[in-house]
Amino acid sequence: MSQAGSSPLYAAIDLGSNSFHMLVVRHIDGSVQTMAKIKRKVRLAAGLDEHNSLSMEAMQRGWDCLSLFAERLQDIPKQNIRIVGTATLRTATNVDVFLEKANQILGQPIEVITGEEEAATIYKGVAHTSGGSGRRLVVDIGGASTELIIGEGFEAKALTSLKMGCVTWLENFFKDRQLNARNFDAAIEGAKQTLMPILGQYTDLGWDVCVGASGTVQALQEIMLAQGMDEVITHSKLKRLQKQAMLADHLEELDIEGLTLERALVFPSGLSILIAIFEQLEIDAMTLAGGALREGLVYEMVDELRQNDIRARTIRSVQNRYQLDCQYGEQVAKLAGKLLEQVGGEAWVAEPQGKVLLKTTAKLHEIGLTIDFKKGGEHSAYLLQHLDLPGYTRAQKFFIGEIARRYREQLTSLPEQHALSGTSGKRVLRLLRLAVLLSHRRNPDLEPCVTLTAEGDKLTLSIDAKWLEANPLTAAELEIESNRQTDIGWPLSIVTC
């Protein structure tokens, strides 16, 4: 059991068709901190015969894995543990044999949830860990089933679990382990036929953004980043990766830059399913979700974590954990937002996410000072890029970190990033630096009255002459900042009024 007075631990176990996963988290400061992630390839679905009877060998692989999990569960209160079985355990005709021994090993009941329950829990995990607004389509490709959900906010509007997965498609269409056009075409067509019954409903509902919440999508993102692409998945990138896969004659010879050995076996089958989903639903782009089934189980257990604004919860959690000055962070964020509106808002920083990322960085930019002042920006960058920040993508975390790295003093160009366009990223940095400089007295009542105007990349800051005369340090800092931005090719003029 966890020690009295310590933050409570929670565990979520997913007995999947390809892998068994255990997630252990700690509830702290209004958020969750991951303490352990344990994963074992069990390939349970591969143990189903033509009569859907689970082989003793597959069961034993599962029991061996659960024996490892059981050790960790001893330290967690029983009421803080959820264990669920999914597609293969739903299908197996002899599931009771497996469950009887599994329950004994774990000392906890295992829930075999329906496909609809699985889809609903996946959506909760996505909704509580992924930012953005509007209606979203969620795709989760498992070992023996694929869940597709359309929802808005925390409400799912359509839930579907289809009987196709990366393990079953491997056995059905790549049984000979040949990576040729015939097998890929058959796998893609088979997935398209499986999708047919839901096309009308999902097309009618529509969606604004699409997110993927599975190992297949995780593998794709790892490959794309390793190959120098951005993290957004598109149909053209999927077809490019299919061509790379087909350069290998056999599955055992598959060698794609960024693809790990453990994911290689089911990668072609998962890729085929995803290509079919993109083509049938005419998806433009997909990003990786922050969480899925296991995260959904955790959020079902912790009532305090259920709130509408995921990013606001994340910011508050980080501020509390690192004892940041919340009032000052809000002051900088408001001033940065005001400056953005003065220069034209989305006419100057085109992407709507630009304002969100500007205000987020404003509220968290001082986090590095909790380590050391001298290299505060460097420490801020490291922390913000490596902390778990539900609601923000990997690209957004990288961008926030790079902006925070440069929030004061020496100014250098931003590295390549994929959260915003290069122009918008540069402009967000300029606004943050000005907001930090103008609010350095940490009291909004002492801020100067300023007007910022823009002609393309040329900025002009108008400021009250009497205020500057009364605040010579700020006047000197503004002159230095004007030179720094101008020297790097970002013209900034300071004029008095």
Swiss-Prot record:
Gene3D superfamilies with a match to the protein in the record: 3.30.420.40, Exopolyphosphatase. Domain 2 (3.30.420.150), Hypothetical protein af1432 (1.10.3210.10)
Domain of life: Bacteria
Protein's job: Catalyzes the conversion of pppGpp to ppGpp. Guanosine pentaphosphate (pppGpp) is a cytoplasmic signaling molecule which together with ppGpp controls the 'stringent response', an adaptive process that allows bacteria to respond to amino acid starvation, resulting in the coordinated regulation of numerous cellular activities.
InterPro entries attached to this UniProt entry: ATPase_NBD (IPR043129), GppA/Ppx_hydrolase (IPR050273), Guo-5TP_3DP_PyrP (IPR023709), Ppx_GppA_C (IPR048950), Ppx_GppA_N (IPR003695), PyroPPase_GppA_Ppx (IPR030673)
Keyword Protease: no
Species per Swiss-Prot/TrEMBL record: Vibrio campbellii (strain ATCC BAA-1116)
Molecular-function GO term, any one: guanosine-5'-triphosphate,3'-diphosphate diphosphatase activity
Disulfide bond annotation, renumbered to this chain: none
Metabolic or biological pathway: Purine metabolism; ppGpp biosynthesis; ppGpp from GTP: step 2/2
Listed name of the protein: Guanosine-5'-triphosphate,3'-diphosphate pyrophosphatase
UniProt GO BP: guanosine pentaphosphate catabolic process; guanosine tetraphosphate biosynthetic process; nucleobase-containing small molecule interconversion
NCBIfam families linked to this entry: PRK11031.1 (NF008260)
Pfam family, one: Ppx-GppA
Assigned protein family: Belongs to the GppA/Ppx family. GppA subfamily.
EC id: 3.6.1.40
Keyword tags: Hydrolase
Catalytic activity entry: guanosine 3'-diphosphate 5'-triphosphate + H2O = guanosine 3',5'-bis(diphosphate) + phosphate + H(+)
PANTHER family tied to this protein: EXOPOLYPHOSPHATASE, RETROGRADE REGULATION PROTEIN 2
